[in-house]
């Protein structure tokens, strides 16, 4: 199929979907390309970002956790966005695209529930019906977000098949869309999946990095030495990285979930510890068995519990432009506690992975003068019960 935009990032990406979905993807690509050139669409999108979502978000300098080091650490505060995470940015763009295509329904998948909440709020705002697929395990561990979705009129459909987590919700959402694409838009929640989704999601998240660049230049008079973001599917990270990719003096660091430790096999780090395959409509690194079956990923954070990764991250990793590391559950939990105790900010467990790596960089070389920015992709309200149960089991509370 001929596409308007390049469907690949190097060897990664593509459109590996049933033939029945090709017209839907073609229509979506055409709508996106025309919308990007339409001043009216851009004005409407920017108005929603500013006056509904609350952009630009703050860039907060950490006051206390850098004590005793020469590190200056800033947090890009996507946790302050309406909806509680960066997810709100791109769903507003996709919901406007759905209206532009004449769709009346939204289909979405969600892991931590943040994309589900974002899809529900955008659908409510723009008068679209919304149904959300969510792994049954995630429905249990993210009950506050499930109720938020219900409050905003969305139907939440628990998925019991497979591992009953995000990968299974993705499969069910795609299955639904293949039978309903004439009236429904599939609002994919991350910068992964078949073309044109990785490109659409990046472009609807790139204001994170654009704002960060302007804010850090105003505050510090220079660009950061590195920007750091957690990577599940990779949308918050690609949103932060996009405007810095050509700034070769700025390090790009993506942080995958190390779970119980890479050596245990219980993690979600396919970029560094997976093999390239075809899954979820794209060619990308993924966690798979010797015979090519998709393995279950694991993370304390439901939003990072994904067995593959967006194709642009795979490309940035293969070219060496970005570095990808992993952080374990325990390290993320310590970073979560540190930010709460010393800065008065409760981060999402997803974002805590990125923060943990920044703290590691700072502590391993306290004498080094470095300017770091962590993308604090979401707030941790949804995670307080998970953290409470772990700390209680350890006898810490």
Curated annotation (Swiss-Prot):
Keyword Amino-acid biosynthesis: yes
Gene Ontology CC: one annotated term: cytoplasm
Keywords of the record: Amino-acid biosynthesis, Aromatic amino acid biosynthesis, Lyase, Pyridoxal phosphate, Tryptophan biosynthesis
Transmembrane segments: none
Residues bearing PTM N6-(pyridoxal phosphate)lysine: 87
Documented EC number(s): 4.2.1.20
Molecular-function GO term, any one: tryptophan synthase activity
Substrates-to-products reaction catalysed: (1S,2R)-1-C-(indol-3-yl)glycerol 3-phosphate + L-serine = D-glyceraldehyde 3-phosphate + L-tryptophan + H2O
Pathway it works in: Amino-acid biosynthesis; L-tryptophan biosynthesis; L-tryptophan from chorismate: step 5/5
Domain of life of the source: Bacteria
Cofactors required: pyridoxal 5'-phosphate
Family of this protein: Belongs to the TrpB family.
Self-association state and partner proteins as the record states: Tetramer of two alpha and two beta chains.
NCBIfam families: trpB
PANTHER family xref list: TRYPTOPHAN SYNTHASE, TRYPTOPHAN SYNTHASE-RELATED
Function per UniProt: The beta subunit is responsible for the synthesis of L-tryptophan from indole and L-serine.
Protein name per its UniProtKB record: Tryptophan synthase beta chain
Source organism phylogeny: Bacteria, Pseudomonadati, Pseudomonadota, Gammaproteobacteria, Enterobacterales
């Amino acid at each position: 199929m001929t596409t308007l935009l390049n469907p690949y990032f190097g060897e990664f990406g593509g459109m590996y979907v049933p033939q029945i979905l090709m017209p839907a993807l073609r229509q979506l690509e055409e709508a996106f390309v025309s919308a990007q050139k339409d001043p009216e669409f851009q004005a409407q999108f920017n108005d929603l970002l500013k006056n509904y979502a609350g952009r630009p978000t703050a860039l907060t300098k950490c006051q206390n956790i850098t004590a005793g080091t020469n590190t200056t650490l800033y947090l890009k505060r996507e946790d302050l966005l309406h909806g509680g995470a960066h997810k709100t940015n791109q769903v507003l763009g996709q919901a406007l695209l759905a209206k532009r295509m004449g769709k009346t329904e939204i289909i979405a998948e969600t892991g931590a529930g943040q994309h589900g909440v974002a899809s529900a709020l955008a659908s409510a705002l723009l008068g679209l019906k919304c149904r959300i697929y969510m792994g049954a395990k995630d429905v249990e561990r993210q009950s506050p977000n499930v109720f938020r979705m219900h409050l905003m009129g969305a139907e939440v459909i628990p998925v019991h098949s497979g591992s009953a987590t995000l990968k299974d919700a993705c499969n069910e959402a795609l299955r639904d869309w293949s039978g309903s694409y004439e009236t429904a838009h599939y609002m994919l929640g991350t910068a992964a999946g078949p073309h044109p989704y990785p490109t659409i999601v990046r472009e609807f998240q790139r204001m994170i990095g654009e704002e960060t660049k302007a804010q850090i230049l105003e505050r510090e008079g220079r660009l950061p030495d590195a920007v750091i973001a957690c990577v599940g599917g990779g949308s918050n990270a690609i949103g932060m990285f996009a405007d810095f990719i050509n700034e070769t003096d700025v390090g790009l660091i993506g942080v995958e979930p190390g779970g119980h430790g890479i050596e245990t096999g219980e993690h979600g780090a396919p970029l560094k510890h997976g093999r390239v395959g075809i899954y979820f409509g794209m060619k990308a690194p993924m966690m798979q068995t010797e015979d090519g079956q998709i393995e279950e990923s694991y993370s304390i954070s439901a939003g990072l519990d994904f067995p593959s990764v967006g194709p642009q991250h795979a490309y940035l990793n293969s070219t060496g432009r970005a570095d990808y590391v992993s952080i374990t559950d325990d390290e993320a939990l310590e970073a979560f506690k540190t930010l709460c105790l010393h800065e008065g900010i409760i981060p999402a467990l997803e974002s805590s992975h990125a923060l943990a790596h920044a703290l590691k960089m700072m502590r391993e070389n306290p004498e080094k003068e470095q300017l770091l920015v962590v993308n604090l992709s979401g707030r941790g309200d949804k995670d307080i019960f998970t953290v409470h149960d772990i700390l209680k089991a350890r006898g810490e509370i």
